[in-house]
Amino acid sequence: MTTPSRKPPADPQKFAVAVGPSAIDGHGAFAAEPIPARRKIGEIRGESISVREAWRRARRQARIMIVEVSPRRAVDASRSTDPLRYTNHSCAPNSVLHIRRGRIEIFSMREVAAGEELTIDYGDSHHQGQLACRCGAPRCVGRL
């Protein structure tokens, strides 16, 4: 009897991304190669948890790396090795986050140069206006 072979999970990163010091906040995700406009950069992976557990963890963590993917489920990327988990907020982002079938995908909105920090708009976040925005964009809203 033969054992069926299992394919390793597909690499969720379509473009090379590196982690480095960010002028926005702590660490950031940076394009390690040029990325064309409107292309999938990659995915953020992590532990699938309930939204209730996500809120519990968010209250005790200094750095939140949790994304709600449905009304009941969230992904905690705190222990993930995916560099995109370090994607910071900007009021003038170069990328956008899409949730599709429970997957967290990041797409470029415009051409992104090698070495440029990848940013998304966190939108309605759980910070409830309590976190100062440090993106430095000309039209920064000031708070998350």
Regions found by a protein language model. Name each.
Residues 1-144:
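Conserved catalytic SET/PR domain of SAM-dependent protein methyltransferases, capturing the structural core
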